[in-house]
């Protein structure tokens, strides 16, 4: 099995509950997207950020390291599943790890463990999905490029839940706590009060 070299950060949402673009929220005076991509560049040779449109891309271009590839949604308005579709059509390898832009606490241990899971399971799984007490973490998962057609079929039927994708393909479940014993990698910031850490 080849190495997992691609990672895509999904950042196309409007952040309605938060009241602003979540990738631009600050932690220690740095935007979430800068924190996340800086960490990812230490582990992956192909780092992508998927944004909703060219206006958002213009804003992010001034923040991101030049090694980060910026993509805009090929299927605007399709939510995270549309971002997965876009990224899978542009990755350099056979699969990519996906992360949301509102998870700046992702750990090195999580990234190393996901790459190891891909080495062990990538040939036999269409997706490698962390599973916690509350169920799947489908936006912290590895998806094979071979599921892009399934994503397109789901979107053509107006099925936009990423959970529907993992139910439709051969998904391997991995205990989230085994990937990151602190579970900090899975901590999302959805509302202003979540920023009080």
Swiss-Prot record:
BP terms from Gene Ontology: Mo-molybdopterin cofactor biosynthetic process
Presence of the UniProt keyword Cell division in the record: no
Reaction(s) catalysed by this chain's protein: Mo-molybdopterin + GTP + H(+) = Mo-molybdopterin guanine dinucleotide + diphosphate
Gene3D superfamilies recorded: Spore Coat Polysaccharide Biosynthesis Protein SpsA, Chain A
Localisation: Cytoplasm
Superkingdom of source: Archaea
Binding site for GTP: 10-12, 22, 73, 102
Binding residues annotated for Mg(2+), in chain numbering: 102
GO-annotated molecular function: GTP binding; metal ion binding; molybdenum cofactor guanylyltransferase activity
Pfam families named in the record: NTP_transf_3
Entry's Gene Ontology cellular component terms: cytoplasm
Matches recorded under HAMAP family: MobA
Protein name according to UniProt: Probable molybdenum cofactor guanylyltransferase
Species: Methanothermobacter thermautotrophicus (strain ATCC 29096 / DSM 1053 / JCM 10044 / NBRC 100330 / Delta H) (Methanobacterium thermoautotrophicum)
Record gene name: mobA
């Amino acid at each position: 099995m080849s190495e997992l070299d691609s990672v895509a950060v999904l950042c196309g949402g409007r952040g309605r509950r938060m009241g602003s673009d979540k990738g631009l929220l600050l932690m220690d005076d740095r935007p979430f997207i800068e924190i996340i991509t800086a960490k990812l560049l230490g582990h992956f040779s192909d780092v992508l950020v998927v944004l909703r449109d060219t206006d958002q891309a213009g804003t992010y271009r001034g923040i991101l390291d030049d090694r980060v590839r910026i993509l805009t949604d090929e299927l605007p308005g399709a939510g995270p599943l549309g971002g997965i579709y876009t990224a899978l059509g542009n990755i350099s390898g056979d699969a990519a790890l996906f992360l949301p832009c509102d998870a700046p606490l992702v750990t090195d241990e999580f990234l190393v463990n996901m790459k190891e899971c891909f080495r062990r399971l990538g040939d036999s799984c269409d997706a490698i999905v962390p599973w916690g007490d509350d169920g799947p973490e489908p936006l912290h998962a590895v998806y094979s490029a071979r599921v892009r057609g399934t994503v397109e079929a789901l979107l053509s039927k107006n099925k936009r839940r990423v959970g529907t994708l993992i139910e439709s393909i051969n998904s391997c479940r991995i205990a989230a706590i085994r990937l990151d014993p602190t579970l900090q990698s899975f901590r999302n910031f959805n509302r202003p009060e979540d920023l009080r850490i």
